[in-house]
Each structure stands twice: as C-alpha cells, then as structure tokens.
UniProtKB/Swiss-Prot annotation:
Subunit details: Monomer.
GO biological process: queuosine biosynthetic process; tRNA wobble guanine modification
Pfam families assigned to the protein according to its UniProt record, in alphabetical order: Queuosine_synth
EC number: 2.4.99.17
HAMAP family xrefs: QueA
Name recorded for this polypeptide: S-adenosylmethionine:tRNA ribosyltransferase-isomerase
Protein source organism: Nitrosomonas europaea (strain ATCC 19718 / CIP 103999 / KCTC 2705 / NBRC 14298)
Gene name tied to this protein: queA
Catalytic activity annotation: 7-aminomethyl-7-carbaguanosine(34) in tRNA + S-adenosyl-L-methionine = epoxyqueuosine(34) in tRNA + adenine + L-methionine + 2 H(+)
Biological function: Transfers and isomerizes the ribose moiety from AdoMet to the 7-aminomethyl group of 7-deazaguanine (preQ1-tRNA) to give epoxyqueuosine (oQ-tRNA).
Highest taxon above the source species: Bacteria
Location in the cell: Cytoplasm
Coiled coil: none
Predominant cellular place of this UniProt entry's protein: cytoplasm
Keywords noted in UniProt: Cytoplasm, Queuosine biosynthesis, S-adenosyl-L-methionine, Transferase
Length: 353
C-alpha cells in the first residue's frame, strides 16, 4: 500500500471553492457523449471549450487510452435492526463471498453480534467495527455479489438528491464495465459510448484496461486542515499484462498515455511507485494520496470530471495541471455553467511540465 505524494504541508482550505447547487448534475444527459469538455493545457495554462465528441481531435495514432473496467455493484440496502429500528447499509468493500465492510446509517451505533434484516430477505450479522466502518457477514446461500445484484440498489453519490431509478442501473455504469466490485462508478468513463470507442480504434488509438474497484471512501470528505494528516482509503487494483505491453510500446514510440479517470491514473502510478519506477502486471492495493508536488511517472494526459471542493480528487488534478491552472479552469467552468460531479461534464488535461 502507498500513501505518498505530499511534498509540503498544505491546507484543505487551499482547495475550497463555491459551487452553485444548480451546477450539480442530478441526471445524466440523454446521450452519454453529449457532454461538454473543457480542455486544460497544464504546460501553458490554456483553456479551450470543447465537446466530448471532439476527444479524437486531441489524440493521434499510437496513443493509448486507459479505461477502468470495474463494474458497479448494487451496493445500497435498506432494512431493520432486530430491535425494529431502520438502517441504511452501503457496502464499502466486498471481502469475500459472504462478508463486506459497510457504512451503516442508523439512529444508534450497532452492537457487535447483533443482526439486521435487509430488504426483508437477507439476514446479516455485525462481526466487527472500526471507526465508521462495520464488517457484516451475510447469512445466505447465495454469494454476496449475487445477493446485491438481486436485491440491492444502485449506489448514487450523496450529492445526487434523489433515489436511484431503473435508468441509473444502466447510466451509472460504463459501457465497458466487466469486473464486479466497485461501489461507485469511475465517472470519467461514463461519457464513452460504443460509437466513440470505435472511432478511437479506427483512428489508431489503442484502448486498454485496468481494474480499480472504487470504494465508498471516494466520497468521504477531508476532515483535517493539514492535508498531510489525511488518511486515504484503500482500494484494490489489477493491471493486465497486455496493458503493460501496450503502454511500453506507446512510450517507446513517443506516444502519449491518456488515463480516463483518477482511478485509472492512481492504479498506474501506484504500480510504478511500488515497483521502483517499473510498470508490472498484477494485483495490488493502493491508498496513494496525490497532491501538488507529486511526480507523475507514466500518465501524460487525464480525462476526468469536475470534482468536489476540498476533496482528494481535486487535490489530484491540482497536482496534475498545477493549482493555479485548476483554479482558473474551475472558475471558467462555473462562469460558463459546466455540469459538475458524477453525471456532469468532462475535463481533458495535459499535464504540467
């Protein structure tokens, strides 16, 4: 596991900004690729208003695009305690076929050994508690993944102020999702449809994959003022051999590596740090916390959405493009009514020198 990237002490307030509520996208657009896209040149601090459909114009034959193919599970469950009190369960991470780390919203803290009845069908026992996270054992013959698929609800982020609908089961999932395990979508990937993927392949851009199962910790706020005191959540990732080979070939030919989403970037950069600057196929876990001053070793460009104030993701993009460049970009996005967060618009960022 990794938790490095901070060069000097910075304050959470350095990453704060005011966002009008009406700019928080509550629904996806009619078509995935209808999103706007703000191009940000970190080298020259330039901005350019574009559309996501223009993405191929910024790429060339031999470049690679790295997508996170994790699949969002229906991680939200409602139920009652044995005493009758209501509970809301959000799976944070699946541990094995019957156990998971979860966040629980209830009127009072749960007691170790107590049981819950979820969705009127599933009995779960509280095995352990570590701060805000509980470990639940789901006492059912079906594996947990199948239980969630049958009885769970799409885990929309807390800033989307509505219940999930049947439509969200499709739209809060990328078209290339394969490996079940995430409890939040890798949202930069939501802009892609099959037409865009085929257009990029025809252009000669290589599309490759990593898997990083996004945890509920991605929504947790930074609660400390000095960011070097923040404890980053841990997420599992996997990098296939063909991805390593494609990136090595791209780099040797002078191409650029575009990471789609902060999760793809963190998987690649974590692997590089773990292996002394070498990209190695295999699985690992990361709690890499990237802030200004971090040296990016492999990713040249980043496609990402607009992130929450005071968040670790905003700190990451500030490291990638430069703090002043990102402040300028976010002011521009707000002034020009870009849509923010999971169902919002995109940024394409060229890294700073």
């Amino acid at each position: 596991m990794l938790a490095i990237g901070i060069i000097r002490s910075m304050k959470t307030d350095d990453f704060d900004f005011h966002l009008p509520d009406e700019l928080i996208a509550q629904f996806p657009l009619a078509n995935r690729s209808d999103s706007r896209m703000l191009y940000v040149n970190g080298k020259h601090a330039d901005l350019r208003d574009a559309a996501f459909r223009n993405l191929p114009d910024y790429l060339k034959r031999g470049d690679v695009i790295v997508l996170n193919n994790t699949r969002v599970v229906k991680a939200r469950l409602s139920g009652v305690k044995s005493t009758g009190g209501k509970v809301e369960v959000m799976v944070e991470r699946i541990l094995d076929t019957h156990r998971a780390r979860v966040l629980i919203r209830a009127s009072h803290a749960l007691v170790i050994g107590s049981t819950l009845l979820l969705e009127n069908k599933i009995t779960a026992q509280v095995e352990a508690r570590e701060q805000d996270i509980y470990t639940l054992c789901f006492m059912h013959s079906l594996p947990l993944i199948e239980l969630l698929d049958q009885f769970g609800h799409t885990p929309l982020p807390p800033y989307i102020g509505r219940n999930a609908t049947v439509s969200d089961e499709n739209r809060y999932q990328t078209v290339f999702a394969q490996e079940s395990g995430a409890v939040a979508a890798p949202t930069a990937g939501l802009h892609f449809d099959e037409t865009m993927l085929q257009t990029l392949r025809t252009l000669g851009v290589k599309i490759i994959y990593v898997t990083l199962h996004v945890g509920a910790g991605t929504f947790q706020p930074v609660r400390v003022q000095n960011i070097d005191q923040h404890v980053m959540h841990t997420e599992p990732y996997h990098i296939p051999t063909e991805t390593v080979e494609a990136i090595q070939m791209c780099k040797s030919a002078g191409g650029s590596v575009l990471a789609v989403g902060t999760t793809s970037l963190r998987a690649l950069e974590s692997c590089m740090l773990t292996n002394d600057g070498t990209l190695v196929a295999g699985a690992g876990e990361t709690n890499l916390f990237i802030t200004p001053g971090f040296r990016f070793r492999i990713v040249d460009r980043l496609l990402t959405n607009f992130h929450l104030p005071r968040s670790t993701l905003l700190m990451l993009v500030s490291a990638f493009a430069g703090m002043e460049t990102i402040r300028h970009a976010y002011r521009h996005a707000i002034d020009n009514h870009y849509r923010f967060f999971s169902y919002g618009d995109a940024m394409l960022i060229d890294s700073q020198p």
